Structures are given as C-alpha cells and as structure tokens.
C-alpha cells in the first residue's frame, strides 16, 4: 500500500528527526504506485501555486512555505518558519526514489 503523508513542521530536514511522523497532518492512501504518483504529481504542482516558496531537498522531496507563516518555539524562544512536505511511504516505509517534478 502506498501513502502520501503531509507534514507540518518548523524544520525542513525532516529525515534528521525520528519523531517526524508526529508532524503528519494529512494522509492519502493508494493501492497502486501509478495511482499514488498521479495524485502526488498533481499535489506538488498545486502546492507550487498555493505556497509562496519551495525548496527541493534530499530525495527530491519538496518543502513548501509561505512568507511570515511562523510558529513560536518555546525551547529556542523565537519564531521559526513553518514548512510543509509530502512524504511518500510504501508499506509504511519512506520511499526515497521520487522523480524530480518540474
């Protein structure tokens, strides 16, 4: 089974933190790779229009953000940029072979 999970976090390098699954705000499930990729491609293209900015990081994973969408970090006593990423999972394991979507 394929899953596309949207995470919301105040950091972009989600793969550096073991608790990234705690940041999931939406999930979409698919039976086939083709169905998942059709949805994922559409989601990335729509997100490029919706968000002010994006970065393409490790494993071709996009991190989207809007200017001035900040969250206060109590531990560091400052406002941090909020990022949104879509993580693809295959049978609950992160799938790292994503194509670059232009």
Predicted regions and their residues:
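Short, mixed-charge low-complexity intrinsically disordered segments
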Residues: 43-102
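Conserved long hydrophobic alpha-helices within structured protein cores
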Residues: 1-6, 36-43
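A structural detector for beta-sheet-dominated domains
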Residues: 5-7, 31, 62
């Amino acid at each position: 089974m394929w899953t596309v999970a949207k995470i919301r976090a105040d950091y972009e390098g989600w793969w550096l933190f073991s608790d990234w699954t705690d940041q999931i705000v939406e999930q979409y499930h698919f039976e086939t790779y083709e169905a998942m990729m059709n949805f994922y491609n559409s989601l990335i293209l729509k997100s490029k229009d919706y968000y002010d900015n994006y970065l393409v990081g490790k494993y071709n994973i996009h991190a989207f953000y809007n200017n001035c969408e900040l969250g206060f970090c109590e531990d560091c006593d400052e406002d941090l940029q909020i990022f949104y990423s879509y993580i693809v999972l295959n049978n609950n394991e992160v799938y790292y072979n994503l194509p670059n979507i232009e």
